[in-house]
Amino acid sequence: MTRSEKVEIIAKLEEGFKASEAIVVCNYRGLSTKKLEELRNNARENNVKVQIVKNTLANIALNNSGKTGLVLKDTNIYLWGEDQLSVSKVAAKFEENNDKFEIKTAHIEGEVADVAKVKALAKMPSRNELLAMLLQVWNAPITNFTIGLNALKNKKESE
């Protein structure tokens, strides 16, 4: 890889890392190409970027984008995106289904996060799910009132 290619990779990573709310670093050693493609497809569906990069290049891009503190060792695959829940869910779900895939560390909301925080975020409902729950709670009194009125109407008609 030439120096100009490295500079280009660093620039692209830096741009992506600056715009991201979450970066998850994972071990992918031993995964087949088919499994990696499955991860990429799942990530693409959830607006999450996935890339395998040398640690030195990733470290430079992370430092240039202000995301410091991550300790990068061995082979890593990087997942990042604007929505921290999506990034966490993609990584955690893929880890559950693949023994050779392991979440190592993350950088979420400007600070280094451990595996437990990533998994906790993955369990949280998405924004759309939360809105659906809220609407369900708001509609419950109206629904119950309507059911009560309908029951009263049926009772009056049967008398």
From Swiss-Prot:
<dbReference type="InterPro" id="IPR001790">
    <property type="entry name" value="Ribosomal_uL10"/>
</dbReference>
<comment type="similarity">
    <text>Belongs to the universal ribosomal protein uL10 family.</text>
</comment>
<comment type="subunit">
    <text>Part of the ribosomal stalk of the 50S ribosomal subunit. The N-terminus interacts with L11 and the large rRNA to form the base of the stalk. The C-terminus forms an elongated spine to which L12 dimers bind in a sequential fashion forming a multimeric L10(L12)X complex.</text>
</comment>
<dbReference type="InterPro" id="IPR022973">
    <property type="entry name" value="Ribosomal_uL10_bac"/>
</dbReference>
<keyword id="KW-0694">RNA-binding</keyword>
<dbReference type="GO" id="GO:0015934">
    <property type="term" value="C:large ribosomal subunit"/>
</dbReference>
<dbReference type="Pfam" id="PF00466">
    <property type="entry name" value="Ribosomal_L10"/>
</dbReference>
<dbReference type="GO" id="GO:0070180">
    <property type="term" value="F:large ribosomal subunit rRNA binding"/>
</dbReference>
<dbReference type="InterPro" id="IPR047865">
    <property type="entry name" value="Ribosomal_uL10_bac_type"/>
</dbReference>
<dbReference type="InterPro" id="IPR043141">
    <property type="entry name" value="Ribosomal_uL10-like_sf"/>
</dbReference>
<keyword id="KW-0689">Ribosomal protein</keyword>
<keyword id="KW-0699">rRNA-binding</keyword>
<protein>
    <recommendedName>
        <fullName>Large ribosomal subunit protein uL10</fullName>
    </recommendedName>
</protein>
<dbReference type="InterPro" id="IPR002363">
    <property type="entry name" value="Ribosomal_uL10_CS_bac"/>
</dbReference>
<comment type="function">
    <text>Forms part of the ribosomal stalk, playing a central role in the interaction of the ribosome with GTP-bound translation factors.</text>
</comment>
<dbReference type="GO" id="GO:0006412">
    <property type="term" value="P:translation"/>
</dbReference>
<keyword id="KW-0687">Ribonucleoprotein</keyword>
<dbReference type="GO" id="GO:0003735">
    <property type="term" value="F:structural constituent of ribosome"/>
</dbReference>
